[in-house]
């Protein structure tokens, strides 16, 4: 379950970083910012049908797989630092976790961070223009299926005046204010 989180630094970002006392973020909190989460059962014989339904629902036409692992990913620390930098994209970000665990952090309307723990079978939809970041947990081993509408552009706009002035950010803010 997602929760509002304490401040995470590069040194502790792979920990839970829960507030004390804990404050859960319910489905309505995520819905207000356009984030959707569901489950995909990889142990079900019909898993491909479930994936095909998600692909159709979100009009995705391209997918690939990423393995984020200290042992296999070149420049792991550098990559994880980039993933954890607060940023946004022009396109939606859709991920299905096939193996391992990590955290997606997203900004609530009041700028607080909401942490979404993800494990095998978790699906996350982040709308275009939302500020977010990602990190593995301490296992440092995640395999994710990435779904895209088109071939990925991989353009990230870090949180700054530059990111705030992106047309997709302005559209996102209008969408979540409606």
From Swiss-Prot:
Keyword tags: Amino-acid biosynthesis, Cytoplasm, Dioxygenase, Iron, Metal-binding, Methionine biosynthesis, Nickel, Nucleus, Oxidoreductase
Co-factor requirement: Fe(2+); Ni(2+)
GO cellular component, one term: cytoplasm
CC cofactor note: Binds either 1 Fe or Ni cation per monomer. Iron-binding promotes an acireductone dioxygenase reaction producing 2-keto-4-methylthiobutyrate, while nickel-binding promotes an acireductone dioxygenase reaction producing 3-(methylsulfanyl)propanoate.
GO MF: acireductone dioxygenase (Ni2+-requiring) activity; acireductone dioxygenase [iron(II)-requiring] activity; iron ion binding; nickel cation binding
E.C. code: 1.13.11.54, 1.13.11.53
Residues reported in the UniProt entry to bind Fe(2+): 87, 89, 93, 132
Subcellular location: Cytoplasm; Nucleus
Keyword match Cytoplasm: yes
Pathway the protein acts in: Amino-acid biosynthesis; L-methionine biosynthesis via salvage pathway; L-methionine from S-methyl-5-thio-alpha-D-ribose 1-phosphate: step 5/6
InterPro entries: ARD (IPR004313), ARD_euk (IPR027496), RmlC-like_jellyroll (IPR014710), RmlC_Cupin_sf (IPR011051)
Top EC class of this enzyme: oxidoreductase
BP terms from Gene Ontology: L-methionine salvage from methylthioadenosine; methionine metabolic process
Reaction(s) this enzyme catalyzes, per UniProt: 1,2-dihydroxy-5-(methylsulfanyl)pent-1-en-3-one + O2 = 4-methylsulfanyl-2-oxobutanoate + formate + 2 H(+); 1,2-dihydroxy-5-(methylsulfanyl)pent-1-en-3-one + O2 = 3-(methylsulfanyl)propanoate + CO + formate + 2 H(+)
CDD domains in the cross-refs: cupin_ARD
Binding residue positions for Ni(2+): 87, 89, 93, 132
PANTHER family according to UniProt: ACIREDUCTONE DIOXYGENASE (PTHR23418:SF0)
Function: Catalyzes 2 different reactions between oxygen and the acireductone 1,2-dihydroxy-3-keto-5-methylthiopentene (DHK-MTPene) depending upon the metal bound in the active site. Fe-containing acireductone dioxygenase (Fe-ARD) produces formate and 2-keto-4-methylthiobutyrate (KMTB), the alpha-ketoacid precursor of methionine in the methionine recycle pathway. Ni-containing acireductone dioxygenase (Ni-ARD) produces methylthiopropionate, carbon monoxide and formate, and does not lie on the methionine recycle pathway.
Entry's family note: Belongs to the acireductone dioxygenase (ARD) family.
Official protein name in the record: Acireductone dioxygenase 1
